[in-house]
Amino acid sequence: FDCRAVNNPGKYERYKPFTGLDEPVITFLEEDGEITRFLDHVYEIVDASVKRYMDRGFTNLMICFGCTGGQHRSVYSAQHMAEHIHSKFGVRVDLVHREQNIEQLFNAIL
């Protein structure tokens, strides 16, 4: 999913040292509101795919987010998507923030 339509905190000097995991960027994105509307639409699409994958017995679905630098908007979006899928479906989620060299595992909820 292309996040470049969402207002970019990276164009402001004070947000450049941060990522979408840091509170200043999170606050910027959430106060602006564009990210919430964007993700609501993405959740709807992905939820339908996850349900269909589960019904069909598939075990791997890759969801990717991108933006200009891979630091703010896409990181925020990927983090929130991973949390959303894990809490809604209880499945294992492997999250990779490639540009930050961060990996996080959300184990399946039994």
Predicted regions and their residues:
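Post-Walker A helix-loop "phosphate-sensing" segment adjacent to the P-loop in P-loop NTPases
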Residues: 82-92
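Intrinsic disorder and flexible coil segments
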Residues: 68-69, 90, 109-110
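Catalytic cysteine-centered active loop of the rhodanese-like fold, especially the PTP/DSP P-loop
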Residues: 59-82
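A structural preference for short, hydrophobic beta-strand core positions in alpha/beta folds
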Residues: 95-97
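C-terminal accessory "lid"/substrate-recognition subdomains
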Residues: 1-63, 86, 99-104, 110
